[in-house]
Amino acid sequence: MAAAAAAAAVGDPQPPQPEAPAQGLALDKAATAAHLKAALSRPDNRAGAEELQALLERVLNAERPLAGAAGGEEAAGGGGGGPGEAEEDALEWCKCLLAGGGGYEEFCAAVRAYDPAALCGLVWTANFVAYRCRTCGISPCMSLCAECFHQGDHTGHDFNMFRSQAGGACDCGDSNVMRESGFCRRHQIKSSSNIPCVPKDLLMMSEFVLPRFIFCLIQYLREGYNEPAADAPSEKDLNKVLQLLEPQISFLEDLTKMGGAMRSVLTQVLTNQQNYKDLTAGLGENACAKKSHEKYLIALKSSGLTYPEDKLVYGVQEPAAGTSTLAAQGFAGATGTLGQIDSSDEEDQDGSQGLGKRKRVKLSSGTKDQSIMDVLKHKSFLEELLFWTIKYEFPQKMVTFLLNMLPDQEYKVAFTKTFVQHYAFIMKTLKKSHESDTMSNRIVHISVQLFSNEELARQVTEECQLLDIMVTVLLYMMESCLIKSELQDEENSLHVVVNCGEALLKNNTYWPLVSDFINILSHQSVAQRFLEDHGLLVTWMNFVSFFQGMNLNKRELNEHVEFESQTYYAAFAAELEACAQPMWGLLSHCKVRETQEYTRNVVRYCLEALQDWFDAINFVDEPAPNQVTFHLPLHRYYAMFLSKAVKCQELDLDSLLPDQEMLMKLMIHPLQIQASLAEIHSNMWVRNGLQIKGQAMTYVQSHFCNSMIDPDIYLLQVCASRLDPDYFISSVFERFKVVDLLTMASQHHNMVLDVEHERSMLEGALTFLVILLSLRLHLGMSDDDILRAEMVAQLCMNDRTHSSLLDLIPENPNPKSGIIPGSYSFESVLSAVADFRAPIFEPGGSMQQGMYTPKAEVWDQEFDPVMVILRTVYRRDVQSAMDRYTAFLKQSGKFPGNPWPPYKKRTSLHPSYKGLMRLLHCKTLHIVLFTLLYKILMDHQNLSEHVLCMVLYLIELGLENSADDDSEEEVSMGGPERCHDSWFPGSNLVSNMRHFINYVRVRVPETAPELKRDPLASTSSDALDSLQNSGTAQVFSLVAERRKKFQEIINRSNSEANQVVRPKIPSKWSAPGSSPQLTTAILEIKESILSLLIKLHHKLSGKQNSYYPPWLDDIEVLIQPEIPKYNHGDGITAVERILLKAAVQSRMNKRIIEEICRKVTPPVPPKKITAAEKKTLDKEERRQKARERQQKLLAEFASRQKSFMETAMDVDSPENDIPMEITTAEPQVSEAVYDCVICGQSGPSSEDRPTGLVVLLQASSVLGQCRDNAEPKKLPIAEEEQIYPWDTCAAVHDVRLSLLQRYFKDSSCLLAVSIGWEGGVYVQTCGHTLHIDCHKSYMESLRNDQVLQGFSVDKGEFTCPLCRQFANSVLPCYPGSNVENNLWQRPCNKSTQDLIKEVEELQGRPGAFPSETNLSKEMESVMKDIKNTTQKKYRDYSKTPGSPDNEFLFMYSVARTNLELELIHRGGSLCSGGPSTAGKRSCLNQLFHVLALHMRLYTIDSEYNPWKKLTQLVEDMNSQVGNEDQQPEVPILYHDVTSLLLIQILMMPQPLRKEHFTCIVKVLFTLLYTQALAALSVKGTEEDRSAWKHAGALRKDTCDAEKCYEVLLSFVISELSKGKLYYEEGAQECAMVSPIAWSPESMERYIQDFCLPFLRVSSLLQHHLFGEDLPSCQEEEEFSVLASCLGLLPTFYQTDHPFISASCLDWPVAAFDIITQWCFEITSFTERHAEQGKALLIQESRWKLPHLLQLPENYNTIFQYYHRKTCSVCTKVPKDPAVCLVCGTFVCLKGLCCKQQSYCECVLHSQNCGAGTGIFLLINASVIIIIRGHRFCLWGSVYLDAHGEEDRDLRRGKPLYICEERYRVLEQQWVSHTFDHINKRWGPHYNGL
């Protein structure tokens, strides 16, 4: 048999064998295996080995299994049972052989016993739930499986749960990655010492079999691989091969799970080079093997980085003089050795594009190994297996197998080296892959396990040149998508940048490689090698330069751009991930003095790269106009390393800075970005589309800002501190295009800016200067100060949740940097600056999360508008911060008006940056400040309060940071000889402030008003002399000077400048001929900055001479200038503060201020209105008029809404609602008047034009969820916990009805109970009324309006036109009747007997069939709506479908449902009294009319009318019982009395008279009381009954026997004893239930409790029908108060009487006779069915309030049980598990497995459990979803973290705890049916949930 099997395996053409019994075959295999094992155990085992090889050769022949995959389908479909069977057979053989003839399971167990189990190593794939503990982690990538996490002790640790993105492995037990204290119990013990050695013979067979098995697998992989054709991707073919191989790979995976012993055998097999050589060499004779080997060689071909097909596009340039030779030899991307690609070039088979032949030389002195360039050579199975894993694009099974082996240390090292060896090949495969996302995840899944271990990373860095390989591979990867840069000089640029539109960047294909690079740089030892290696640094800077200037934006000036490119996403992601994150990784290792050398290296090569870049883009001195790139990674590297050098390494800044010319160049592009930001916000780039705004926002956004805008501003601060301040300031205003605006003239012409942009650009320029001079992030602030400033800025904009703060505070963006969010300093700073506001509810139901809000002292002392401006993504946030600041000042009484941004003192500058303050003390800035102050004072156009604010801010900054050479007293008033060249004598602001400027020469258009009033028309020599001496200057003659200076510097230092001849781009571009003629005018000014400030004070305050120097009254202010009153205020305060500071700093200033104040201030010149301004004013006037018209209209509408608003439409809190008055309240008016909210008319409802109430009809099962226990049930959180719904109100009523239907006539049963406990129809209204015809046209307009949110007009849904509450029907108001009319009905003196007759007579009158009117149509229509609201199963309980009795039952049950629900809304009792608050704005009166109208169409045959049985004695009782062949009617004592009440009332003609109502209640109370006595008698024991019978019999003859409970109880017992009711009780029943000790008090309590539900419903009904108020009372007196209210208790009766219930009785006929009659029906029934008879008598009357399930405190408890729970239908774990919070059912959200008739499970369950309302907790998201009919909404979460925040989708994975308050609100919305009104975001679910 073995021979036959073997022969079949070889594939000889054999006749089909008759199938042998499997068992025999197994025995045979076992015998062969045992024989071979014995043979191999001998000392000379050569023969055994050969025999085994021959067997394996046959069994594992590689020819057949993949024939189906590789060679078409025939083989697979062909005979012999297909390849599957043969493979299974081969695997069976392998298992038998490994076990050596024993059982395979036993073998596995034996091997497991030798597992040292030091590491967990459990491998998981994407979406697996794992944990990360930062307290225990050494590497930030550390993760634990759930089991190890819960087995370890992490209490109080900073941990979180996360859903794995790419897969991972458990690190428990690995002390390289985590601290031992965090190991779980299983991996804590280093148990290897206790494990005995593995017996040699146990794994001997494995050592023989596995090499052959793995070789066979490799042959399959070779055989199955076909190079993908150029046109079609081959994924399908690859997947087919992999599917066929799945059993083999699973087999290997199972072997790895056997533990350490088996893993070490596998390691030997996989890494043994001899084995590999022997097996792969001996292939000569086998043709098939040859073919597979050839395929392998073809596949290997493209594995190196050398491209033989590279086309030479540009020759390699010789290295330019002065550039680093290394850079030139290496990949000199920045110096332009890479040409543009010819787009017609086909990609070679490798998918890389030819990019010029480059000299390939050694990358660094350390690179001895050239193997990265060459084709791979494999020396072991492991190497080839990894090769195929890559080739097949990382199949999940293979990845898992390779990772499962990692706990074996020897394997881990070998595998890591192999992975590094294949790194370039991985990159090439990844680039070509069509599934790069999946592949990326799988690569990282592997690499993160290898590179997170520092020791291992260091080892492969040393032994395998890991760093060289990574950098080279990254460089090569990016080279395939380079294009010529168009920045600056488009034609002559030699710079190449990445093309952000390429898939490589767009799809983030590079991220796995960058992620690995960042990971290894997080290890100090590896990073140090990188920073020491000059060659690597050069290469890396070349790599970074590929991103320098990418995604260039060119401003559209004519028409809107046609296609808005979205490439900026790719650009920002690339800079952050590929440039910034590695930079942060390197920076984290440059923290101490000892690492100075590293910083010097980076700075040096960075500057070289920058110099190369400037050369390559051909940059001279001016940036090209209308161009901006946000990407300057080289600048940012340079800036960040400079900052680190000064801050942490005590390096001298000047030693790292280049010459002045380079500094001037360095500042240009970052400054261009700042100017462009202002342009973008001024809408100057509007034609470029929204994406340019997106770029401006991303640049400052929290995840990017500290890698982008912060380094840019820091670099500008460094340049400003070292360059000439006048040059810098003039450059800023030039860049911002506002130079022309800075003139004293009232008119000017700006050649580079439209007038409408001037103001915002000027604001931008000044704001930028303020930020530049105020910001200290890199200039001396400590990390904690920075954190505090960032936090305060964010909190000032808005209150924030903890998680949003964590997200908004810019942190080191390198995830491996070890800076942990939520670390100690974050929490301590947060508690210092903010107060926590617990989660709250706002009226209307919107839920707030836990928020942090700034403390009062933070607003007072730390609010920093500059930081806020820097960090706002949206401009509105700045306004929000100011509004909040204003509110604080008003609340705290510090300032009542509209404050200006406060001036905040800055932390001191680091000495290296002192030069920055020279900007504040340069003449150019002082000229600008002077000019702007003057222009503001003279009301020139385009100047705003914001400009003034910034001007004053800059002056104050200058005074705070006074210049060092402060010998200002000696510099007298400044003689004329000092100021020929400029306006001011010196550069010190303190002295320049008092310098008077008399005349200024300006260039103005000829039309300017200045020319008309030239003060110096006479040309006398005196005048000219004085002009000469007054220091007149044209503003910004300095600009030209600085330009000259810059040009000189450049010419001096740039030896090659003569080679580069290019026209200088004019800085002011303008259309020819567009500029008007300018002429020179001379203005008389005669002001100083001080005088302008004082006049400004007058202008701002609106009073002449308003400024009075405070030191004249109180000299103290000069000594103690920090006066709190100046801290907060408006412009006036700011001016006062500045003048005081100026006076404090200089006696001269103080004197001049006093002098100016003494002079009478001349009035400000009147404002002339120009034509343009007049136009603006007209516009304003028109706007104002339009506004007034709008106000009028709004006021009119508001008056309509007033009544609605007054009732405080707070649907959330029923207890404080005021009812909406539906009708007018004057009792003398006979007819109710209604307002129509659509047409606004008032009037009564009529037959022809009925008015209706806006109502929402909904099916409800809330009543059915009531239980007899007040404690809510708990959500099951273990298998053994189950919820059974036997004790719910719905279940009990269901059982009762089916019991009645089994024994009694169906039509009678349907009148004996109520339905609607499940699926009852609840009607609620907002209280607004409308004409029904108006409503129809309103619906029509909604139908035509396509923009509908969340409701379906076709289903009749709409929102109330006034209050927007959701509704779906209109309930007609019956004409005439007014509730209050019934109040003044005359008291009735008729006897009870007369009233009983009247009731009977009125019920007997047939209801008049309504005439065909609009009203009757509407009544019919609304009845149809009510029926359609609930499902058929909830309204059809009759045995004969469609029976009228059923209709009848449904209608009165609707009334019952609404009354019972109102009771529940009132808390289950009527103790609180009051109007119908909890019933919302009740519509019961109107509902009653509709129901009564329809019920009167049916008549109950007077024979069957229960009223007869209640009020008359029957002559022949036997006729009632019914005979044998027909079922009897339901005995009256089994009837539900409340149902009887509703039947009786609805059968009466409406409106009902109060006396008839009271009569019906009195009659029914007698029946109810008798039922109570009967139920009590059944509850008592035999002894109780005999005692009660005896006691009552004694008093039977007293006068009040009919009102004595003892007598009546005694009589009921004696009557019921005639049947078998009491005989059934066995002794065992008594033993089970502990008997109650009955006392007279407890019996009275029982009777009252039995009757109370009826009294409550009757009282509510009386309240609604007759408008009587409900009395409020204590709980214990509820019975007596309600009885009095209903007229059951005589008014003179003492309510504190202990036995009061019987006193309410008013028997219509002799009590004992009628009781006898009622009891006879029962005894007849119990003759046959005693047990059922007794069950029907005991009715559960006291239902407690309904509750949702009780949830556990900690969400993890729910999550751990349910997220792994399997679906009962498909037994798989659902993707989106959910649990119903009403009944605890586990459901699959959106699960197709549980779909029935196109309804998914949640929708179906919501219909079955809640009649259309479902409340589900989504396990994987922690949120609650509400289903209401055909709509659904996300409600929010009832589980919050320690900071009061939701964690939707468990993204943060922090522990969550129940928020009781939220859960109560959810429950209350469920009970009060207000989901539709409170939750606003509804959408259709299309039955797909």
Curated annotation (Swiss-Prot):
Segments passing through the bilayer: 761-781, 919-939, 1807-1827
Tissue distribution: Expressed in numerous cells of the smell, touch, vision, hearing and taste senses. Expressed in cells of the olfactory pathway, including the olfactory cell layer of the main olfactory epithelium (MOE), a mitral neuron cell layer of the olfactory bulb (OB), and a pyramidal cell layer of the piriform cortex of the olfactory cortex (OC). Expressed in the vomeronasal sensory epithelium of the vomeronasal organ (VNO) and the mitral cells of the accessory olfactory bulb. Expressed in tactile tissues, including the dorsal root ganglion, trigeminal ganglion and follicle-sinus complexes.
GO cellular component, as recorded: membrane
Claim: Transferase is one of the keywords in the record: yes
Span of zinc fingers (UBR-type): 118-189
Record pathway: Protein modification; protein ubiquitination
UniProt xrefs under PROSITE patterns: ZF_UBR
Catalytic activity: S-ubiquitinyl-[E2 ubiquitin-conjugating enzyme]-L-cysteine + [acceptor protein]-L-lysine = [E2 ubiquitin-conjugating enzyme]-L-cysteine + N(6)-ubiquitinyl-[acceptor protein]-L-lysine
Gene3D superfamilies: 2.10.110.30
Superkingdom of the source species: Eukaryota
One term of GO molecular function: ubiquitin protein ligase activity
One GO process term, biological-process aspect: embryo development ending in birth or egg hatching
Disruption phenotype: Knockout mice for Ubr3 in a B6-enriched background exhibited neonatal lethality associated with suckling impairment, but can be partially rescued if the litter size is reduced. Survived adult knockout mice for Ubr3 had female-specific behavioral anosmia (decreased sense of smell).
E.C. numbers: 2.3.2.27
Chain residue ranges for the region called Disordered: 1-27, 338-362
Membrane association type: Multi-pass membrane protein
Coiled-coil segments on the chain, per record: 1167-1199
Cell compartments where the protein resides: Membrane
Family: Belongs to the E3 ubiquitin-protein ligase UBR1-like family.
Record protein name field: E3 ubiquitin-protein ligase UBR3
Organism of derivation: Mus musculus
Lineage: Eukaryota, Metazoa, Chordata, Craniata, Vertebrata
